[in-house]
Each structure stands twice: as structure tokens, then as C-alpha cells.
Amino acid sequence: MRIGIVNDMPLAVEALRRALAFEPQHQIVWVASNGAEAVTQCAADTPDVVLMDLLMPVMDGVEATRRIMAESPCAIVIVTVDIEQNVHRVFEAMGYGALDAVNTPALGIGNPQTAAAPLLRKIQNVGWLIGQRDNRGKVQVVPPKAGGARQRLVAIGASAGGPASLAVLLKQLPASFNAAVVLVQHVDEVFAAGMAEWLASESKLPVRLARDGEPPIPGQILLAGTNNHIRLLRNGSLVYTAEPRSFVYRPSIDVFFESVANYWRGDAVGVLLTGMGRDGAQGLKQMRERGFLTIAQDQASCAVYGMPKAAAAIDAAVQILSLEKIAPRLAEVFD
């Protein structure tokens, strides 16, 4: 992987250099000391991934992320000291297209390889996304059991740019919206609770983390909240699971959409929002093949037109809509 580093602290840059040295396939192509330099460097030599600090002089990491994704788009991972204290900035950067966030590896404390492991896992996940590898076996579609009340479900998947897009979509849903909503956003479990709280502040409907073993609940929005996949079981409950292990990025949108296609008994809509790579495209296609309405976000309103593009390419979406039109469409379907 060709990697650019954006950080104004020499010790942090050195910590990143040492961490990356554990994986010889990674190459540092440039180092920028502020966001403005990073924008210029990306335009001249776009790397595979940028490791972006948040708090810097001249231009901070949020604005630099916005500029890079608009001018020279590439994978961006936020790497900063104490990300838990900068959650809102992290979400803002993710809204502009950053994929993930992780603490800067500690320098000179404990085992250096152990300290580097979280960052290296994030980079590995990014490699999976931008490489668009598909290591799955064929998923067997099992028809749902007959009978039971017709319940309503909206299954939404998002990645890079997702937090801001989800906020826009959820804000437009009326307080009377009576379908269950389950969100799968590519976000580390460290940020999941904070993201649920933030989305709740933007929504007329309650938003919280999904609990293992509970069913989707009408009028509530549940967010996948761990680093495992979330699936719908035959009995209608949600479960967190490490399987399938072939999916490097967790939680996987495909895993959830496919489980909805297999087991949901009522009416459902699948929605695939902005994101890098192709996660969710095959699952959305399975939902369409089961007769569910499927929607992909259009290119013009996406921060990163990757996952919806992959869905459009395989004819997985019944409708391709701008972000502003998705919530009104959901309200119309479930009126």
C-alpha cells in the first residue's frame, strides 16, 4: 500500500513510521505537516491511503478530508491522539468521506508490535475495500417461513460519507414513521455508541445500538454496534456473529442484507448509501431478487460513489435516488 501521512507532530510521524515498518508491503510516499500540504500532495501523487491527523495548523484534518475527497479522492483513515475526545470531529470527517479512525500508536510504551496492531488492521481493511476483493462462497437463499403478520423493515448500509448522509436521511423521517430501521455503518465499535447518540440528536425517532437477540422494532432505529457482523435470524431476531470470517470489514452490509433477503417475513426496503468499495451491492441484489424494493444513492449526492455504483452496475437497485429523496420515498412506501 502506498501511504501518505498528515501530522504536524514529529513524534507522531515517527510512531507511524515504526508501526508501518512491521508490514514491509507498505510504502510511505510522502509526509505533510498540515491539511493544506496534504491537499497539494494528494493532487500531485494520490496514495492508496492517507493517515490523517485531526488537529493541525493552517488546515485541520476535517477540512483536508473534505478537500481531498472533492479534488483527489482516496481512502482516508483518521489517526490522532485520543480519538474518544474528538468523536464529533471524527464523525464530521467521516461525513466527508473518511473511512475509519484509530488512535496514534504509542511510542516507547509496551510492546511496539502490539501498539501498531490496531492501525495495521485498519489499513488491512482499507486494502480489502479498495481492492474490492470478494472472498465469499455462494450464499444459499432459504425461503422465509410462511405466515405471520406483515411487518415493515428498512435496512440501510453506509460506509465512507455515511454519518452525514444518515443524519440527513433520518432527520427527514417523520415521528410517525412506523417501520423498523436497522443501520449498518462501517464504523469501529469504539465510536458506535457516540454515533447512535449523535444520530438520535438529528432524528425525530429514537436511535440506539442494536442488542444481541432482539428483533427490529417498529418506530425505532437500531445501529449495528460491534466489530462483528449483524444478521437477521429465521425467528426474526438480530444476532451479532463473527461468521463469515472471510469478510474482512465488519460489520458487513452484504451479510445483513443477505440475511434480510433470506429470512424477513414482511415488507422491506434496502437502502445503500455512500461508501468505498462494493460492500452491500450483492446483498441489495438478493433483496431485489426476493421482491423487496431496493434503493441506491445517486452519484451526485454521494461523498464516495463506490458501493452504490457497484449496486447500479449489477442492477441491484430498483431506484437510484438523490439523498434528499430517499426519506420521502420511504415515508411514501410505508404510509
UniProtKB/Swiss-Prot annotation:
GO terms for molecular function: phosphorelay response regulator activity; protein-glutamate methylesterase activity; protein-glutamine glutaminase activity. The modification 4-aspartylphosphate is found at residue 53. The keyword Phosphoprotein applies. Residues 144-335 form the CheB-type methylesterase domain. GO terms for cellular component: cytoplasm. InterPro entries: CheB-like, CheB_C, CheY-like_superfamily, Sig_transdc_resp-reg_Me-estase, Sig_transdc_resp-reg_receiver. Belongs to the CheB family. This is Protein-glutamate methylesterase/protein-glutamine glutaminase 3. Phosphorylated by CheA. Phosphorylation of the N-terminal regulatory domain activates the methylesterase activity. It is an enzyme of class 3 (hydrolase). Keywords: Chemotaxis, Cytoplasm, Hydrolase, Phosphoprotein. Gene3D superfamilies: 3.40.50.2300, Methylesterase CheB, C-terminal domain (3.40.50.180). The active site is at residues 159, 186, 279. Contains a C-terminal catalytic domain, and an N-terminal region which modulates catalytic activity. It comes from Pseudomonas aeruginosa (strain ATCC 15692 / DSM 22644 / CIP 104116 / JCM 14847 / LMG 12228 / 1C / PRS 101 / PAO1). It is found in: Cytoplasm.
